[in-house]
Every structure is written in structure tokens, then in C-alpha cells.
């Protein structure tokens, strides 16, 4: 069955509206979907497809047909992406807007349902009376109509549809540079959707989807319209999207996704060639602080706060110097800097002194994993090396952060790091902890601060006491409510420190005593391994030394002995000091020389590195520029080819459409014409068979009939109107005098009223004018005096202004004169310059013309000289030709004389001597193939053969008809005819051999006729003109020839037949 004919989009749209009008929306949606996905729709203009697509999107949203909409949108994108991107954006935006409107409507409907349920519940008067066993059972089985159930039934399906719409649109727009802006805006809308409706699962899927799109961008970078992450604008848009993703992840408290978003941002920042804005980086570090705080990674949390504070300082400096806009930088007022400095100090103080991880840090696998993780976090913060607790404090003190921090934080630092006293620590720190606990942001640091305080407490107690009561420790670790530390917390802290090897404390639960490690030979760790949550510091570096423990004394006795011996030698032996000082001076000199040399080498190496970096960057830039140029050219070529193809297809479609429209218009005109004519005889006839003549005749007949009908109607109507008009006038004549009298009375009354009103108004106006005149007459003297006084006062000012105006005019006149004079001078200079340039151009043209004339003259002289030389050569050639001709004439005369002598007295063949065959003026000619005689030789041969054959009749003397063939070799070897050389393959014929035998004295020499002589090869073409018969070889001679008697010789045919 053949496919159905393809319909136009306008007809499809009309049909869809008709189906919608009869409540057939699913059928309309199916019709539109089939039309869009049809292969024939690819050649339809986009302007006609756009309304179809908008209606399809609207119907698919109404009916929740997401898959149909997705299929149609993909097809529409493939059709329109190379011609019109705006229509794709319009359709996709419409799709998202309709889905969002449906979600909003569903939310409003759910609110209405819930409010009606609550109202119904509140209208019950007696709640106890309404509780029946049946209602209790029904409520138990079906459950209450709660808000969650209402949302699941009404809102959730539309939320799911909206989420699928976002996914569909993002998948359609991915990795297309022309649709990139809409892609980023849609991603932003999807983030807002997840944040507004708290869709955590969908947010994770959305992040993964965007991550996959970026990964596949490099894979399909060679495709047309692919995105280029090396483009700064594209990378900036991706960074903005990732920062929004990070913000939403933090708001939704999805810390794992937030950390992955941070890694994505760091990857994009490493690709970017332009630095990110400070406001974006401030947001980046601020979100990192929250992520690290939730993960209890206090070390990197403090490092992130330090980076945030440094960024605020840089932004404040840039804004103060005016090198950057305020909009590109975060808020960096004094309050913001104080807050950042406070949190830097507080977060650094919260870093644990010992490890708080439950895993053993001494294990190799855990150490390696920890190092890798710390390295990743260090790179995320943009730091050269991993941060430490001591390093953060040194950096904070060097930047005077304590002065910017809040006073209670400064006191807390002094108590914990400067003047730590275990017996009074809790009394001093309790008010500060209370203030910190009152602040919601600082309250999160109380628990790590307690861990730090307990660590300091146990480390210093271990230096003083060997055993201590647990109750005493509890009394020392008294914190304000609600931050009180219990015995269980202390025991847990001690067990964790012992497990990690950071503490050496034994607990006796029976007596409640804590015993510190007193083994003098125990090997305590000098530096403990840190964990991912903090960094352990050395005992000497972070804990105040109150007194040395016995184990420390035992471990340091050799060191102390060496120091005592060294001091003794230095005081007893003066030469020891001299040698030591001399060695130190020599070492200093060597170090100074080596430092200078190393400095120069470092500078040279730095210059080399910089030069190589510059060359590499230039090469990379050139390569990128070349790649971009090639890609641009390729894209332009593809676009031109695609545009040409589309233009050609559009042209063909337009021509076909116009032809169809002309045909339809013609058919409709014929149908309308026939319908207007109302011709009964043509109803059954095919319209296509009607020609213009027939239609014209039918039309003329119809017009004639209509004309006659109209004329008849006009005649009847005119006659009727004449009768009516005559009757009207007869009746009117009776009433005209009465009507005329009434009209005259009305006109006279109106005239009298108008006249009286006019006179009254004129009198009133005259009275008012007279009164005004009298009032003004009384004022005239005062007016005249005031005017004269005013003129007197203003005259001086007027004169002054007039003089100023005249001076200003004079100044302007002078300025204009000066300007005109300068203009004339400038024009004169320009005119002289132009004349000079014109004169130089004329002189240059004259020089060039003279040089050209000289070149032509020299060329003519050269041509004249060559012509004279050619003329001389031709003269020489003519002389040579004349001498040659003379020699030929002499040779011809000799040959003629010899022929006449031979014809008169025939004699035996005798070969000429070598001297006769070689002339001085004729070089030897080799008788090779193609070495034919010249035209002069042929003409001479013709003349000679003609002269010889003329006196002899053809029938009487057949032998004499071939004098040229019988001529001896001496006649054929003149000056113009070179002799034949005895070359390889050029053997003599039998005739030549016979003639040679006869000349050498053979017995049969006299019997050989002239015919036995070899023919002249050069005269072969003139054989037909020599008077010889065509087949004279078969004709017997006039005289019988005798056999030579030699065996194996040639016998002529006639001789063989005669025998």
C-alpha cells in the first residue's frame, strides 16, 4: 500500500485544531507527531513548522506525553539547527514554561484541597461523637488525607514531568555552541527547581548529567558547532553554572555533591586562561569552609578561611586603587574583614593537636590514602604545600590578624597558645565559650576547642604528675553549661589518644586514678602522625615545657654531656676557638662565593626557562590560532555548502509551490467563474478540458444575458419612478404656499431675537471698554515716568553691553580674518605642494617616456642590424645558389652530351672512375631510406629524360625510351647526386654485378643491353613520365638477348616463356 500523501503544515495545523474542537486532542497530538517525524518534513520551511511544533508541545504537556514531545523535539532540532536557532529556543522555552505552569497549578490545587479538608475537619462540632467503630476502622485502613498524600497524588506527577522536561531539553541542547546560552540558562532553571522543591535525588542526577556532558564535549570536539572549552566566554558560562551548582548543593546540604562540584570548578579553573572574578572565588572558598566544617576536616577548614581572608584583602586593595570594579569583588568592608579574621583564628585554634581518627595512622595503606587526599585538598585550595597548624598561626600573626579579630577570640588565642595554665584554664575560658556559644556560627567550634583544651591539659599534666585522680581531672575540665564534659567523654578521649600512640595514660577504674607513662626507657614519638581531620604537632613545638620528665632526661643525657664538653673545650683551649672561628670564616667565604655563583646560575636558568616558556606559549598560541583558523574555514565551507544546498532546495520547493499554486488558482478561478455563470450544461464536463476561448465565449454570452436583463429591469423601474414622482409633485403643489408662510414667520422671529442679543452684547462691551479707558488714563502719567526712569537706568547698561558686543564682534572678525589668512596660506602651501608633486610626476613621466623612447630606438637599431645581417646572409645564400645552379647547368650539359654520345654509339658499360663520382662542391650522399633527391635533381632528371625521349618514337625504339634507367653510374653521380656507399645491407643488384663482369672483360659483356643497368633509385617517382610502358619488364626487347652462360643467373619472364 503506498504511503499517504504528504500534507502541508498549514493543513495539518488546521486539521489538529478541528480535532481539538471536537474533543479529539489525543488524535490531534498523534497527527502532529507523525507530521513532525516524517522524512518529508525536513524540506518544509521552518516558519511553517514552528506553529505546528508549538501546538504539539502544548498538547503533549496537557496530556503528559513526555516521550512524544521528546521525539518530536529531537527531530525538530535536527531540522532547524542549521538554519534557524531562534525557533528551537522558542519551542524549548515554551515547553519548559508550560510544564512549570502545570506544576504551579497543581501546587495551588493541592493547597486548595488541603484547605478544604482542614475546613471540613474544623466544622465538626463533636469530635468524640463523630468517632465510630466504622470510621476508626476506615481511617486505620485508608490512612488520613494528609498533606504528603495530597502532594503525592496531585503535585508529584507534574514534578516528575517537569524534571523529565528539564532532562530532555538539556540533552537536546548539549555540546552545541549555537545553543550554549539556552543550555546554561536551562541548567540554572533546573537548579532552581531542585532547590525550590527540595529534590535531592534529582539534583544528584542533574549534576551527573552535566558532568557527563562536559566529558563528552572533548570527544565530539571535531563535530560542527561543537563547544570549545578553550573559549574564555564558554568556560566562563560553565564556571557560573558550576558555582550555582555548588550553591544549591550547600543549600540542600548534599556535602558529597558539593565537594564534587568544587572539584569540577577547580578543573575548569585550571583550563581557564583568564583568572576568575574575585567574587566567584570568594564564594568558592566560603563554600569550601562549610564543606570542610561538615566533614570535620578542621585543618583544611582553617586553610580555606585563610584563603578567603587573603582574597578579601586583595579585593579591598584593588577597589581602593581603582584597578577593579566593585561589582567584580566581594563585600570587603571592615566588618567583613573582622569577621573573616575572627573565623581564621578560631578555626586555626580548633585544629586538633593530636589525631582524632579511629584508624591507625601508622599503617602504610592509610598513610598513603591520607597523603593522596591531603594532596587533592591542597590543590583545591590552590596552595603549594599542605597546610599545618603552626604554619597557619605563623601566617595569621605575620598579617596581624589578631588585631582585626574580635576581642574574645584574641583572649582565647592568648589562653590556649601563649599562656596555657592547666589549673586555671577552665575558669579563664568559660566566659569566652559562653560568648562563642551564643553565636550560631561560632557554636560549631566548641567541640573541637574542647578536644584541643583536653589535649593541652593531659600533655602538661603528664610533665608534672605521675598519677592523678580522675575526679581532679574532671574538676580541671569544667566547662559552662550546656558544654559540660562528662567522665565518659574524658575516658573516650584518653582511649583514643592511647590507641593512636599520642598519649601514654593508664586508667584504674577501681581506684579512679590516671597513671602517666614513667618508663625512662620508653620511646615516645617526637612527632606524631596526623590524620585527615587535623595535624599532630611535636611536643616541644606546641606544648609549653614546664619541666623535663625522667624519660626525657635519660634520652637527652648524651646531648647534655656533649654540650658540657664543648663548652669546657671552648674555655680551656684558645686554639680551639681560633680554629673554629677560622673554619667558620672560611666556610662563610666559600658560602658567599658559592651563593653569588649559584645566584647567577639561577638567574641564567630563570632567563632560559622564561625564554623557553615564551617560545612554547608563542608556538602554542600560533598552533591554536592555526587550528582555529582551519576550523573556522572548515565551518565556513560547510556552512556555505549547506547554505547552497538549502538555497537550492528552497528554490526548487518554491518553484514547485508556485507552480502548484498557479494551477490551483487557475482551477479555482475556472470553478468560481462557472459557478457565477450558473451554467447547467457544463456541470458534468471536466474543468481541465475547458480552454480560454470556450470560457470567454461562455462569459460573453452570460454578460449579454445579464446586460439585457438589467436593461429591462431599469426600464421598468424608471417607468415606475416617473409615475411616482409625478404623483408626489401634484400633492406637493397643494401644500407649498402654507409651508412657505410658516417658514417666513419662523425666520423673522429668529432674526429679531438675534438682533436684540447682538445689540445688548455690544452695549455691555462698550461700557466695559469706556471704564477700562478711564482707569488706564489715570495710570498713564505714572507709566510714562516709570518708563522714562527705566530707560535712563538701562541706557548705561545697554551701552556697556553694546560696547562689549562690538568688541566681541571685532575679536571674532579678527579671529575669522586670521583664520581666513591662515586658510589661504595653508591652501597656497597645499596648492604649491600639489603643483610640485604634479611637476615631479610630469618630470618623472617625461623621464620614463624618454627612457622608453631610447629603449625603442635601441630596439629598432638592433632589429635593423639583425635585418642587415639577415640580408647579407641571404645575399651569400643567393650567390651560393647561383654557383650551385651554374654547376648544375654545367653538369646537365655534360650529362646531355654524354647521353647524346651514348645514344649515337652504344658501347659496353664501363664504371666511371672515383674522381668522376666525387666533385669538389658536392659532398658524398649516403643512399639511405628516405634520402630522396631534391627538387632540382628531379627537375633536371625530367628535363633530361624529356630531351632524350623526344626524337624517338615510342613504338619503334622501346629501349631508347628508358635512357635514364640505362644511364651509367657516372651520369648519376654528379655534384648534386652523391655516390652510393657500400654499406651493410646495401648489396649491388644482379644488373650491377653483370655490368661489372662485362667491364672486367667477361665474354658476354657485349651482349648485355642498356636495360641491364641498375635503375636510378632517386628517379623512381618520375618513372611514369619517362615514356616507358608500365609493365616493360615483361615486354621482350627489340633484339634477342643471348644468355650469359653463367649458372644460377636471373632469366627474364619472356625468355623463360620463349624457351
From Swiss-Prot:
Keywords, in A-Z order: Coiled coil, Cytoplasm, Initiation factor, Protein biosynthesis, RNA-binding
UniProt feature, compositional bias: Basic and acidic residues: 794-902
InterPro entries, sorted: EIF3A, eIF3a_PCI_TPR-like, PCI_dom
Cellular component, GO annotation: cytoplasmic stress granule; eukaryotic 43S preinitiation complex; eukaryotic 48S preinitiation complex; eukaryotic translation initiation factor 3 complex, eIF3e; eukaryotic translation initiation factor 3 complex, eIF3m; multi-eIF complex
Subcellular localization(s) per the UniProt record: Cytoplasm
GO BP terms in the entry: formation of cytoplasmic translation initiation complex; translation reinitiation
Entries under Gene3D superfamilies matching the protein: 1.25.40.860, UVR domain (4.10.860.10)
A Pfam entry, by short name: eIF3a_PCI_TPR-like
Residues covered by region (Disordered): 794-1059
Top-level taxon of origin: Eukaryota
Positions of the PCI domain: 337-521
Ranges in a coiled coil: 99-130, 586-905
Principal subcellular localisation of the protein: cytoplasm
UniProt KW Protein biosynthesis keyword: yes
Any one GO MF annotation of this record: mRNA binding
PROSITE patterns to which the protein is assigned, alphabetical: PCI (PS50250)
Listed Low complexity bias regions: 908-927, 942-958, 965-988, 1005-1024
Protein family (similarity comment): Belongs to the eIF-3 subunit A family.
Quaternary structure note: Component of the eukaryotic translation initiation factor 3 (eIF-3) complex.
Reported function: RNA-binding component of the eukaryotic translation initiation factor 3 (eIF-3) complex, which is involved in protein synthesis of a specialized repertoire of mRNAs and, together with other initiation factors, stimulates binding of mRNA and methionyl-tRNAi to the 40S ribosome. The eIF-3 complex specifically targets and initiates translation of a subset of mRNAs involved in cell proliferation.
HAMAP family registered for this protein in UniProt: eIF3a
Identification of the protein by name: Eukaryotic translation initiation factor 3 subunit A
Species whose genome carries this gene: Neurospora crassa (strain ATCC 24698 / 74-OR23-1A / CBS 708.71 / DSM 1257 / FGSC 987)
Amino acid at each position: 500500500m503506498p504511503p499517504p500523501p504528504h500534507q502541508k503544515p498549514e493543513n495539518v495545523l488546521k486539521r489538529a485544531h478541528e480535532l481539538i474542537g471536537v474533543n479529539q486532542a489525543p488524535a490531534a497530538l498523534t497527527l502532529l507527531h507523525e507530521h513532525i517525524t516524517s522524512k518529508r518534513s525536513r524540506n518544509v520551511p521552518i516558519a511553517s513548522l514552528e506553529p505546528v511544533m508549538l501546538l504539539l508541545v502544548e498538547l503533549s504537556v496537557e496530556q503528559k506525553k513526555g516521550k512524544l514531545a521528546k521525539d518530536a523535539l529531537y527531530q525538530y532540532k535536527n531540522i532547524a539547527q542549521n538554519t534557524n536557532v531562534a525557533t528551537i529556543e522558542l519551542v524549548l522555552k515554551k515547553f519548559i514554561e508550560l510544564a512549570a505552569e502545570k506544576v504551579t497549578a497543581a501546587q495551588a490545587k493541592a493547597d486548595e484541597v488541603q484547605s478544604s479538608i482542614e475546613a471540613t475537619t474544623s466544622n465538626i462540632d463533636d469530635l468524640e461523637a463523630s468517632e465510630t467503630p466504622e470510621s476508626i476502622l476506615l481511617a486505620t485502613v485508608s490512612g488520613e488525607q494528609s498533606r504528603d498524600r495530597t502532594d503525592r497524588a496531585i503535585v508529584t506527577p507534574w514534578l516528575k514531568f517537569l524534571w523529565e522536561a528539564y532532562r530532555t531539553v538539556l540533552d537536546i541542547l548539549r555540546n552545541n555552541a549555537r545553543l550554549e546560552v539556552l543550555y546554561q540558562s536551562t541548567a540554572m532553571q533546573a537548579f532552581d527547581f531542585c532547590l525550590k522543591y527540595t529534590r535531592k535525588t534529582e539534583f544528584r542526577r542533574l549534576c551527573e548529567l552535566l558532568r557527563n556532558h562536559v566529558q563528552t564535549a572533548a570527544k565530539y570536539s571535531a563535530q560542527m558547532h561543537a563547544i570549545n572549552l578553550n573559549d574564555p566566554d564558554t568556560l566562563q558560562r560553565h564556571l557560573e553554572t558550576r558555582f550555582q551548582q555548588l550553591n544549591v548543593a550547600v543549600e540542600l546540604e548534599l556535602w558529597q555533591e558539593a565537594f564534587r562540584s568544587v572539584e569540577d570548578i577547580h578543573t575548569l579553573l585550571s583550563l581557564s586562561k583568564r583568572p576568575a572574578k574575585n567574587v566567584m572565588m570568594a564564594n568558592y572558598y566560603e563554600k569550601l569552609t562549610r564543606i570542610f566544617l561538615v566533614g570535620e576536616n578542621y585543618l583544611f577548614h582553617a586553610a580555606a578561611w585563610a584563603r578567603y581572608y587573603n582574597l578579601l584583602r586583595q579585593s579591598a586593595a584593588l577597589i581602593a586603587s581603582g584597578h577593579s570594579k566593585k561589582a567584580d569583588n566581594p563585600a570587603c568592608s571592615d566588618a567583613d574583614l573582622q569577621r573573616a579574621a575572627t573565623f581564621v583564628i578560631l578555626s586555626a585554634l580548633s585544629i586538633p593537636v593530636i589525631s582524632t581518627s579511629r584508624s591507625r595512622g601508622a599503617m602504610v595503606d592509610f598513610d598513603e590514602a591520607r597523603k593522596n587526599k591531603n594532596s587533592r585538598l591542597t590543590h583545591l585550595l590552590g596552595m603549594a604545600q599542605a597546610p599545618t597548624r603552626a604554619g597557619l598561626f605563623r601566617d595569621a600573626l605575620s598579617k596581624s590578624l589578631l588585631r582585626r579579630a574580635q576581642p574574645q577570640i584574641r583572649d582565647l588565642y592568648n589562653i590556649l597558645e601563649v599562656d596555657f595554665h592547666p589549673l586555671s584554664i577552665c575558669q579563664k575560658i568559660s566566659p569566652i565559650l559562653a560568648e562563642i556559644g551564643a553565636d550560631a556560627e561560632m557554636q560549631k567550634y566548641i567541640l573541637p576547642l574542647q578536644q584541643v583544651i583536653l589535649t593541652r591539659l593531659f600533655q602538661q599534666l603528664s610533665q608534672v604528675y605521675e598519677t592523678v585522680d580522675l575526679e581532679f581531672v574532671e574538676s580541671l575540665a569544667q566547662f559552662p553549661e550546656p558544654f559540660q564534659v562528662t567522665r565518659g567523654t574524658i575516658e573516650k578521649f584518653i582511649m583514643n589518644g592511647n590507641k593512636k600512640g599520642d598519649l601514654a595514660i593508664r586508667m584504674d577504674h577501681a581506684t579512679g586514678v590516671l597513671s602517666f607513662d614513667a618508663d625512662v626507657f620508653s620511646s615516645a614519638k617526637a612527632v606524631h602522625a596526623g590524620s585527615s581531620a587535623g595535624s599532630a604537632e611535636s611536643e616541644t613545638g606546641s606544648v609549653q615545657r614546664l619541666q623535663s620528665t625522667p624519660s626525657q632526661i635519660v634520652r637527652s643525657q648524651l646531648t647534655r654531656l656533649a654540650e658540657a664538653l664543648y663548652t669546657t673545650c671552648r674555655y680551656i683551649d684558645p686554639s680551639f676557638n681560633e680554629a673554629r672561628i677560622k673554619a667558620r670564616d672560611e666556610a662563610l667565604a666559600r658560602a658567599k662565593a658559592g651563593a653569588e655563583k649559584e645566584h647567577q646560575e639561577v638567574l641564567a636558568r630563570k632567563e632560559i626557562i622564561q625564554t623557553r616558556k615564551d617560545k612554547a606559549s608563542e608556538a602554542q598560541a600560533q598552533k591554536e590560532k592555526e587550528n582555529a583558523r582551519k576550523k573556522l574555514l572548515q565551518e565556513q565551507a560547510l556552512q556555505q555548502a549547506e547554505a547552497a544546498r538549502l538555497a537550492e532546495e528552497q528554490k526548487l520547493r518554491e518553484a514547485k509551490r508556485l507552480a502548484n499554486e498557479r494551477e490551483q488558482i487557475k482551477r479555482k478561478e475556472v470553478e468560481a467563474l462557472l459557478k457565477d455563470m450558473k451554467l447547467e450544461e457544463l456541470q458534468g464536463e471536466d474543468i481541465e478540458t475547458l480552454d480560454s476561448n470556450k470560457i470567454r465565449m461562455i462569459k460573453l454570452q452570460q454578460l449579454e444575458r445579464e446586460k439585457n436583463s438589467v436593461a429591462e429591469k431599469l426600464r421598468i423601474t424608471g417607468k415606475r419612478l416617473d409615475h411616482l414622482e409625478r404623483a408626489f409633485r401634484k400633492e406637493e403643489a397643494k401644500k407649498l404656499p402654507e409651508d412657505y408662510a410658516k417658514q417666513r414667520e419662523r425666520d423673522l422671529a429668529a432674526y429679531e431675537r438675534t438682533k436684540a442679543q447682538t445689540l445688548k452684547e455690544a452695549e455691555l462691551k462698550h461700557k466695559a471698554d469706556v471704564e477700562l479707558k478711564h482707569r488706564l488714563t489715570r495710570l498713564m502719567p505714572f507709566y510714562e515716568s516709570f518708563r522714562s526712569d527705566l530707560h535712563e537706568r538701562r541706557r548705561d547698561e545697554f551701552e556697556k553691553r553694546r560696547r562689549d558686543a562690538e568688541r566681541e564682534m571685532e575679536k571674532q572678525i579678527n579671529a575669522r580674518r586670521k583664520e581666513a589668512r591662515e586658510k589661504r596660506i595653508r591652501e597656497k602651501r597645499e596648492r604649491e605642494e600639489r603643483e610640485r608633486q604634479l611637476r615631479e610626476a610630469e618630470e618623472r613621466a617625461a623621464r620614463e617616456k624618454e627612457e622608453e623612447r631610447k629603449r625603442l630606438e635601441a630596439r629598432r637599431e638592433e632589429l635593423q642590424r639583425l635585418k642587415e645581417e639577415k640580408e647579407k646572409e641571404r645575399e651569400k645564400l643567393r650567390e651560393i645558389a647561383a654557383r650551385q645552379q651554374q654547376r648544375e647547368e654545367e653538369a646537365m650539359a655534360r650529362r646531355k652530351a654524354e647521353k647524346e654520345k651514348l645514344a649515337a654509339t652504344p658501347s659496353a658499360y664501363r664504371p666511371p672512375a672515383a674522381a668522376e663520382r666525387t666533385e669538389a662542391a658536392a659532398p658524398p650522399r649516403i643512399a639511405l631510406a628516405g634520402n630522396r633527391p631534391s627538387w632540382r635533381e628531379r627537375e633536371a632528371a625530367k628535363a633530361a629524360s624529356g630531351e632524350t625521349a623526344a626524337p624517338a618514337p615510342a613504338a619503334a625504339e622501346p629501349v631508347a625510351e628508358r635512357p635514364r634507367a640505362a644511364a651509367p653510374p657516372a651520369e648519376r653521380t654528379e655534384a648534386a647526386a652523391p655516390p652510393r656507399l657500400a654499406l651493410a645491407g646495401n648489396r649491388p643488384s644482379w644488373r650491377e654485378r653483370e655490368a661489372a663482369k662485362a667491364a672486367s672483360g667477361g665474354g658476354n659483356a657485349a651482349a648485355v643491353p642498356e636495360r641491364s643497368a641498375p635503375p636510378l633509385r632517386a628517379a623512381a617517382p618520375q618513372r611514369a613520365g619517362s615514356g616507358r610502358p608500365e609493365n616493360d619488364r615483361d615486354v621482350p626487347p627489340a633484339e634477342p638477348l643471348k644468355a650469359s652462360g653463367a649458372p644460377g643467373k636471373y632469366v627474364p619472364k619472356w625468355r623463360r616463356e620463349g624457351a
